[in-house]
């Protein structure tokens, strides 16, 4: 069982913890966050979006206790000073959002810590991995600081892979209709992005995303072929990728959906979902898949222009992939 330390117990950190509770291959043994243990325990137990955690949760002065198991809580600003080895931590999940450069994230390495997973797009990382897409490229000997990409790249890449392998992708444009996140203001307040400065729960907010271009990190054959943007919307969770692509081959809606369904039931099972139900965003709250095709929305125009919608719980799905990645890396050797 892999021992995990979580650096940053925010939305993703806590959802990684929840996901780890349901995975017998990993266990969280230590958490680093500047917030006190009592507050962290309360926020773990009670969640507006995901509901009350089905576990006994309490707090001591420097630890939280979940189902009788004590997890140490540290409050250290400098990653290089963290005593991960005192608790046997082997993999650190870096989820503060602050240490996304390799030069910062690698400060966790040393002692018992063999690998770092950055729960965000990174810079200078050893490899970016999207489970189900390029995880087999992970090389334990050379990859120590690993990015799990973004939630949106984790949604887009699996079905872009299917489209490209089955029909060939010439080019495409993506929009993610994305729930608001902590990188927006709840009321109109200063922000470096003047649109994200506006009240998140009251506005649809056009903004940027690097998710489409980042697909090339895990699918090099699509480099330069995809681009896109985001619209942040007034929902607290669950997002939707809208992809329009021009394919090499002429296809029908039925052929495209059949390819998605086959992948969802086969090589991408658990990663890519497929639905023919007339569902809405709240129905995907808590969905552990990275991406779920909304088959009723698939459209084809003039044979080779295809529009695809795919849902994702941008917290739960992504956090489950972080845990899956940690388990996979361990299976290949730390």
Curated annotation (Swiss-Prot):
Note the InterPro entries from the entry. Answer: GlycerAld/Erythrose_P_DH (IPR020831), GlycerAld_3-P_DH_AS (IPR020830), GlycerAld_3-P_DH_cat (IPR020829), GlycerAld_3-P_DH_NAD(P)-bd (IPR020828), Glyceraldehyde-3-P_DH_1 (IPR006424), NAD(P)-bd_dom_sf (IPR036291)
GO molecular-function annotation terms?
A: glyceraldehyde-3-phosphate dehydrogenase (NAD+) (phosphorylating) activity; NAD binding; NADP binding
Query: What residues does NAD(+) bind to?
Result: 11-12, 33, 77, 119, 182, 314
Which EC numbers characterise this protein's activity in its record? Answer: 1.2.1.12
Annotated binding of D-glyceraldehyde 3-phosphate, by residue: 150-152, 181, 196, 209-210, 232
What intrachain disulfides are recorded? none
- Catalysed reactions, semicolon-separated: D-glyceraldehyde 3-phosphate + phosphate + NAD(+) = (2R)-3-phospho-glyceroyl phosphate + NADH + H(+)
Is Nucleotide-binding included in the keywords of this UniProt record? yes
Extent of the signal sequence: none
Superkingdom of this protein's organism? Bacteria
State the compartments where it is located: Cytoplasm
Q: Where is the active site?
A: 151
Q: One of this protein's GO BP terms? A: glucose metabolic process
Extract the Pfam families matched here: Gp_dh_C (PF02800), Gp_dh_N (PF00044)
Identify the GO cellular component terms for this protein.
cytoplasm
Pathway(s) where this gene product acts = Carbohydrate degradation; glycolysis; pyruvate from D-glyceraldehyde 3-phosphate: step 1/5
Stored SUPFAM superfamilies: Glyceraldehyde-3-phosphate dehydrogenase-like, C-terminal domain (SSF55347), NAD(P)-binding Rossmann-fold domains (SSF51735)
Mostly located where? cytoplasm
Q: Which Gene3D superfamilies match?
A: Dihydrodipicolinate Reductase, domain 2, NAD(P)-binding Rossmann-like Domain
UniProt keyword list? Cytoplasm, Glycolysis, NAD, Nucleotide-binding, Oxidoreductase
The record, for SMART domains, names: Gp_dh_N
- Please give the subunit comment from the record: Homotetramer.
The function of this protein is: Catalyzes the oxidative phosphorylation of glyceraldehyde 3-phosphate (G3P) to 1,3-bisphosphoglycerate (BPG) using the cofactor NAD. The first reaction step involves the formation of a hemiacetal intermediate between G3P and a cysteine residue, and this hemiacetal intermediate is then oxidized to a thioester, with concomitant reduction of NAD to NADH. The reduced NADH is then exchanged with the second NAD, and the thioester is attacked by a nucleophilic inorganic phosphate to produce BPG.
Q: Which family does it belong to?
A: Belongs to the glyceraldehyde-3-phosphate dehydrogenase family.
What is the official name of this protein in its record? Glyceraldehyde-3-phosphate dehydrogenase 1
